[in-house]
């Protein structure tokens, strides 16, 4: 009994320390990104509004893990001015401290301006945060389109215990209405999050779609992650998701290649 207690304590401490490491040092890891094909002309009202948006998200992220913005959206203004409006949001993983959230968002802003120069719309997902802006008002509108998925090359066959634990974790994640949730069953762990402007029912629906794609697209993979436009879900078998060295799911090390091969963002 004493040995069992010590093992459980060590497992808890390992999980806690791993999660803490993931919360800060891994938050900058690139997941996916996309740019709209339409480009704006430099030194125009849209560029000014976009720069205001990007400056606002950096300021806000030091105090809040989520916020949305509509810049230049004045219904009383001319049509040319309203077409220069920028709608956007940012979100950090809720387990990040405000200081780490701010660093992640600053990193996202730096990257998105380099990767999507003069784009009317752009989206960037890092391990710890998400940034998106468009000229169309997408805020609060449900979108479950698939943006990115990764399945481990290692799979599990005929392991009833693993699949039961995995399904327990996914069922728990799928039921959340709180925006962010961490779950564990036995040696299987996972977490999920919705964008902060979703209603509880839309969050649950988005996560149900994400979990369904995890099962359908990744099958018996020992670890997998699926990102939809407004939510994501991950799971992994303990010991496979190596927090100390980043993903162990054969992530492409080239930021440019990952970004370039993505399809254009869908426009509203």
Predicted features along the sequence, with ranges:
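Extracellular secretory-pathway ectodomains and N-terminal mature segments of eukaryotic proteins
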Residues: 1-268
